[in-house]
């Protein structure tokens, strides 16, 4: 681009900015708000990584038709004015602000116009940390509901700029269900997901090479369901479950989802075999949600004694357990350790995950069961 073209581009951009600013309402005769600020998503008083995309939001207070948002840091600031109730930050200015304010706190003030009156809400904080998150997150896109579904995709999204791409689309697999996608070591070079129905299987990706696997043998009650990769990528640990949805007749309760039977098994992707232990394949015990420790020496999972179902579903409580695993020989340990006892704690553990550095284990505690889609976790 020559100098004349660059000059024209700069002038056009300045004119556009001036027009946008002139068209955007500016607060005047501002009064303090007498009610709490309602945002969606709820971004008030949160800690954010320095590489996150703009925290755009909606002001959900009734009757808002214009907003002004001021973000002030120690050395830089950003302000936007917009019609409607949506606050959208320019990506370039947002990135510059976060880069300048690493390790500092941003003060965010929202002023909104309602019925011709400008109201200023109490400020809240965004703490900017110098640490970066991995740039990509994968998720399953499906219509909300629990009876029927149609379009289904597994997608990847960049948390730095909102860009997305489709990894798998059931419109290309005769409408088959796809679920339980997992990445190993937070890497795109090691991943898998289950393709259900006739001709289905587990689709394994290792360094861009795809394989369809049947992760089931005669000792297992079902094909693989919930799973995790061993750090070396050779093994995966899975539960096999018979999952039952049960609808309530009470108006304030909608749905229960529970396992009638469930066991664990390890898949040896190189040896093309499933490895089962009698300690985690007991018909009197339900085992589910297995995950490897960061060093691969332990398998953490949830375990509950079987109870009559559905009548005793609220007495179904899972403990947090672990068992050793020897990756050199592909063998399970010879004892089970209980780390969090459901009977003593009067709760139920689900979804354990080990931190990559091996220092922490994250899990959720429910009142009972392991499905939190229609029940609330206990405050603990």
Language-model-detected regions and their locations in the chain:
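Conserved, compact domain cores that house catalytic/ligand-binding motifs in diverse enzymes
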Residues: 139-212
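C-terminal motif of bacterial Sec signal peptides marking the signal peptidase cleavage site
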Residues: 21-22
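Conserved small/polar residues in nucleotide/adenosyl-binding loops
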Residues: 374-379
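Residue position within the beta-strands of beta-propeller blades
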Residues: 138-139, 191-193, 237-239, 300-302, ...
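Blade-terminus and WD-like Trp-Asp/Gly-His loop motifs, strongest in beta-propeller folds
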Residues: 129-132, 182-190, 227-235, 291-298, ...
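Short, solvent-exposed loop/turn segments at conserved positions within beta-propeller repeat blades
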Residues: 147-150, 196-198, 255-261, 311-318, ...
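Multi-bladed beta-propeller domains
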Residues: 32-42, 76-93, 160-176, 205-223, ...
């Amino acid at each position: 681009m020559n100098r004349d073209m660059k000059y024209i581009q700069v002038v056009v951009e300045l004119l556009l900015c001036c027009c946008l600013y002139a068209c955007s309402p500016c607060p005047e005769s501002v009064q303090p708000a007498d009610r709490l600020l309602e945002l969606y998503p709820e971004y008030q008083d949160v800690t954010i990584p320095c590489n996150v995309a703009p925290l755009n939001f909606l002001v959900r207070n009734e009757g808002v038709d214009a907003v002004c948002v001021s973000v002030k840091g120690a050395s830089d600031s950003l302000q936007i004015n917009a019609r409607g109730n949506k606050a959208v930050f320019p990506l370039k200015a947002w990135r510059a602000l976060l880069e300048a304010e690493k390790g500092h706190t941003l003060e965010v003030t929202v002023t909104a116009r309602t019925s011709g009156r400008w109201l200023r809400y109490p400020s809240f904080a965004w703490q900017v940390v110098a640490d970066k998150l991995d740039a990509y997150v994968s998720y399953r896109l499906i219509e909300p509901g629990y009876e029927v579904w149609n379009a289904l995709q597994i997608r990847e999204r960049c948390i730095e700029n909102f860009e997305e791409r489709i990894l798998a689309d059931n419109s290309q697999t005769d409408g088959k269900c796809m679920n339980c996608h997992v990445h190993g070591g937070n890497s795109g070079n090691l991943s898998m997901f289950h393709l259900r129905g006739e001709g289905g299987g587990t689709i394994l990706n290792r360094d861009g090479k795809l394989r369809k696997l049947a992760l089931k043998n005669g000792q297992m009650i079902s094909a693989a369901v919930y799973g995790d990769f061993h750090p070396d990528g050779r093994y995966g640990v899975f539960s096999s479950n018979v999952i039952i949805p049960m609808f309530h007749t009470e108006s304030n309760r909608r749905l229960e989802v529970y396992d009638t039977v469930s066991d664990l098994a390890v898949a040896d992707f190189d040896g093309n075999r499933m490895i089962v232990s009698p300690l985690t394949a007991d018909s009197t015990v339900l085992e589910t949600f297995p995950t490897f420790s960061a060093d691969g020496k332990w398998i953490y999972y949830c375990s509950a004694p079987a109870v009559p179902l559905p009548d005793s579903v609220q007495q179904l409580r899972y403990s947090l357990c672990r068992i050793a695993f020897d990756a050199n020989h592909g063998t399970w340990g010879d004892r089970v350790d209980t780390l969090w006892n459901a009977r003593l704690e009067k709760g139920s553990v689900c979804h354990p995950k080990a931190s990559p550095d091996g220092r922490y284990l994250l899990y959720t505690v429910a009142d009972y069961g392991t499905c939190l889609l229609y029940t609330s976790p206990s405050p603990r």
